Amino acid sequence: MNVPATRKDFMIVNMGPHHPSMHGVLRLILSLDGEDVIDCEPILGYLHRGMEKIAENRTIIQYLPYVTRWDYLATMFTEAITINGPEQLGNIQVPKRASYIRVIMLELSRIASHLLWLGPFMADIGGQTPFFYIFRERELIYDLFEAATGMRMMHNYFRIGGVAADLPHGWLDKCLDFCDYFLTGVAEYQKLITRNPIFLERVEGIGIVSAEEAINWGLSGPMLRASGVRWDLRKVDHYECYDEFDWGVQWQKEGDSLARYLVRIGEMTESVKIIQQALEGIPGGPYENLETRSFDRERNREWNDFEYRFISKKTSPAFELPKQELYVRVEAPKGELGIFLIGDQSSFPWRWKIRPPGFINLQILPQLIKRMKLADIMTILGSIDIIMGEVDR
């Protein structure tokens, strides 16, 4: 009797780059032993657009429309980090009203980003209903953005020394109404999701990251705080006017996918508290430091020459970057978003290095999903919260 030989080869499966749960064009080459994941190799770069090199050939104002394409679900943070660098290099003072407006916009953007994380995350693990619910509140936030900036996404609102325009009449009251309404929405999410036994089976104890591992891997944001490390750059770096508000850092100690969910849910309620305090205490005054506007020297032109008619009729604003090195960072929804900037006494940066939180947080994915089940990949990847525009840059 011939006994059939048992094959011990692992099955190789390509997950992505067009898988609906990949949150962008991410490709995972998986080695499977039945349902068990033996190995994982992430393949990046499908959305690489050379954002760092583009920055070296643009002024700060010219580069602002590009930065909103990194994390296109939280564009206020990419704009904030882009103008914070030149402001610190030039020691530029931001008016108090502009700082309050920035904080309001940043926290609204944080809520919108967390909402669009929550919906697809629940859909990935089988809960379709919250995916449709989150768009109610998200639409209200985008209405506020559109009223203030003219754009629902890709706002191009922040400027060196302030913001592009003041808040329109009635915007503050409309935003306060949203905050009151949104708190009831968060309570509905928690009632629907947090104690759901099927949800808990899918996320509890899945993708555990210890505090030591989180620090060694350089994780940040909810990934770090869910592992028991109370690290929030809004408290650590004291940027903008966050110190003037009463709010707490959200953290958990379990380090699993459930802890990361709870951190983000808690952050949305804390963001509402910050926004409400900022709306009630926003001062008057200018929304922009007009003294920061420096212009290129205008060359002697003939009235009807080619350059006057076809290239430019007025000079565009330019900010000369001092010959210094600087690293600036903000607490984005996904973690620490940083810029390493080198100026060389010109309008263009000599070097512009981006530190994207999604790219750093994604590095731990192969370790987390080894020896897990195939279905757990979507739970772990969804709990990390990545945007491939930011990962690939």
Curated annotation (Swiss-Prot):
Report any Pfam family annotated for this entry. Answer: Complex1_49kDa
Q: Which UniProt keywords apply?
A: Chloroplast, Membrane, NAD, NADP, Plastid, Plastoquinone, Quinone, Thylakoid, Translocase, Transport
List the source organism.
Populus trichocarpa
GO biological process terms held by the UniProt record = photosynthesis, light reaction
Q: According to the lineage, what is the superkingdom?
A: Eukaryota
Q: What is this protein called?
A: NAD(P)H-quinone oxidoreductase subunit H, chloroplastic
Question: Key word NAD present in the record?
Answer: yes
Q: HAMAP family, alphabetically? A: NDH1_NuoD
So what does this one do?
A: NDH shuttles electrons from NAD(P)H:plastoquinone, via FMN and iron-sulfur (Fe-S) centers, to quinones in the photosynthetic chain and possibly in a chloroplast respiratory chain. The immediate electron acceptor for the enzyme in this species is believed to be plastoquinone. Couples the redox reaction to proton translocation, and thus conserves the redox energy in a proton gradient.
| EC number from the UniProt entry | 7.1.1.-
UniProt-listed SUPFAM superfamilies? HydB/Nqo4-like
Molecular function as annotated in GO: NAD binding; oxidoreductase activity, acting on NAD(P)H, quinone or similar compound as acceptor; quinone binding
Q: By its UniProt entry, which NCBIfam families does this protein fall under? A: PRK06075.1, PRK07415.1
The entry's family comment says: Belongs to the complex I 49 kDa subunit family.
* Classification via PANTHER family: NADH DEHYDROGENASE [UBIQUINONE] IRON-SULFUR PROTEIN 2, MITOCHONDRIAL, NADH-UBIQUINONE OXIDOREDUCTASE 49 KDA SUBUNIT
On subunit structure and binding partners, the annotation says: NDH is composed of at least 16 different subunits, 5 of which are encoded in the nucleus.
Q: Which gene encodes it?
A: ndhH
Reactions performed catalytically? a plastoquinone + NADH + (n+1) H(+)(in) = a plastoquinol + NAD(+) + n H(+)(out); a plastoquinone + NADPH + (n+1) H(+)(in) = a plastoquinol + NADP(+) + n H(+)(out)
Q: How does it sit in the membrane?
A: Peripheral membrane protein
UniProt-listed InterPro entries: NADH_Q_OxRdtase_suD, NADH_UbQ_OxRdtase_49kDa_CS, NDH1_su_D/H, NiFe-Hase_large
Compartments reported by the entry: Plastid, Chloroplast thylakoid membrane
* GO terms under cellular component: chloroplast thylakoid membrane
